[in-house]
Amino acid sequence: MSGPLANSFTYSKPMTTMNSIDTFSLSALPRRFILASATALALLGSQAFAADKLPVTASFSILGDLVRVVGGERVVVTTLVGANEDAHVFEAKPADAKTLLTSKLVVINGLGFEPWAGKLIKASGYKGETLVATKGVKPRHMEGEQGHGAHAGHAHEEADPHAWQNPNNVALYVRNIAAGLAKVDAAGAVTYQANAEAYVKELQALDAWTKAQIATIPADKRKVITSHDAFGYFAAQYGVKFLAPQGVNTEAEPSAKQVAQLIKQIQREKIRAVFVENMSNPKLIAQLSKDAGATLGASLYADALSNADQPGATYLQMMRHNVTQLVAGMKLN
């Protein structure tokens, strides 16, 4: 440039380097705006990640745990009957029907454990796959039980639904779950099978450990009182005698005559090991223990897992807790 303006014009390089822009932008924005933006991005990311997973509904907490084990990172599991809740007396809500409609697979125990499941599935309009986890399990039958469709005045042979109390049955459960998941998510079939077989090894170890623990108790001392008859499969597998004021479900209260007979049996057989279950009303068993002169032990987990901060948050934890408490109680007999 020439002329009179040449001396008055000065060129300055704009201060707009990348570093200066970044520094200015971040320092100028309010801290709470930055944090809110980061939180929103993280939430969007987690929602997108969850959307990629297979939605599965399990009828109750023990099944929910098994589905999570087999499904791993490929599934997101919703449980209808949660921790410390009683599936025998569960009443479905409209929200439960909505849950089914978003599921690709519904997993139930079967053997009459969830008498409400069929009605809920039909009422919800769910058209997807339903898996009965007890497929292939040899059911234990009991004569004279009332409930789950029995009617007063008639003999009724009822299948005991608590098949998970024998780890060998749970091996069938997880293999059935693996097959059910693979049916609706063929791409994950290898993963599901591998997870199931790895868990079967843990179940075999649990079975061996339980046998070793029970073996420390003399055979004539292996007697226990529990709230309801939920341990029949455990009893058959490990040679422990269980007595209960209630049958295989918790709906029907025992009569005064039945309670009196049980008290006499407890006293006659000198049973000191008495346990209440986490989802049962403890008043009956506590009074029974007092009247019979027995010792009330820690809670057992029969039909439901515990919350995460309690000792029965998973199936394996539940079983090990139960065995430990049972052995301690039977030592008092």
Question: Which sequence ranges carry the predicted segments?
Answer:
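N-terminal secretory signal peptides that target proteins for export/translocation
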Residues: 1-28
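Sec-dependent N-terminal signal peptides
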Residues: 36-40
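N-terminal signal peptide c-region/cleavage motif recognized by signal peptidases
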Residues: 45-47
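N-terminal export leaders
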Residues: 30-35
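Extracytoplasmic metal-acquisition and chelation regions
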Residues: 50-333
